[in-house]
């Protein structure tokens, strides 16, 4: 299960077999599932409009879309994509949580190095004050203690075979 932004399917080309890519995840407690998941939970019945309930105090989710199963050469293999709209942790303006993966669509010809060169200033501006507030340390003190913070860009096409970053969904290669 992946909690995703309503724009997820406008970034990733996972066409919906059923449902509308533009509206499937706009409402809270909506979910798009794979064909295999639809068959697993609903047999031969149409999954659209049905409800999936989860443990661990998560709400029930209404099926608003069905996609083909994720290809084997993808860097993620989730079988359910639930809307994070209305999900309380997603409303936080804290930059301290590392629990989100962010994908960017860049214009053709974008200079990756120039864009990455702006990231340290973002860390200083947005994370520095939060580290000070939450930990009582300046950003430099935080780093002196062996911690690191930063962002890097990686082309989506290189993740499956070549990624060696920490906390990937699956090992590269």
Language model feature labels by segment:
Residues 22-26:
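Glycine-rich loop motifs involved in handling phospho/adenylate chemistry
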Residues 2-18, 29-172:
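Mid-to-C-terminal secondary-structure elements
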């Amino acid at each position: 299960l992946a909690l995703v932004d309503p724009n997820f399917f406008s970034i990733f080309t996972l066409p919906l077999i059923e449902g509308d890519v533009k509206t499937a995840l706009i409402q809270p407690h909506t979910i798009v599932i794979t064909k295999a998941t639809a068959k697993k939970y609903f047999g031969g019945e149409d999954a659209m409009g049905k409800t999936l309930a989860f443990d661990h105090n998560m709400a029930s989710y209404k099926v608003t879309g069905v996609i083909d199963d994720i290809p084997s050469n993808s860097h993620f293999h989730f079988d359910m994509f639930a809307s994070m709209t209305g999900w309380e942790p997603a409303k936080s303006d804290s930059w301290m949580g590392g629990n989100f993966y962010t994908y960017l669509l860049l214009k053709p010809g974008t200079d990756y190095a120039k864009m990455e060169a702006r990231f340290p200033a973002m860390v200083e501006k947005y994370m520095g004050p939060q580290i000070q507030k939450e930990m009582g340390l300046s950003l430099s003190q935080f780093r002196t203690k062996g911690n690191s913070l930063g962002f890097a860009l990686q082309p989506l096409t290189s993740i499956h075979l070549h990624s060696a970053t920490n906390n990937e969904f699956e090992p590269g290669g």
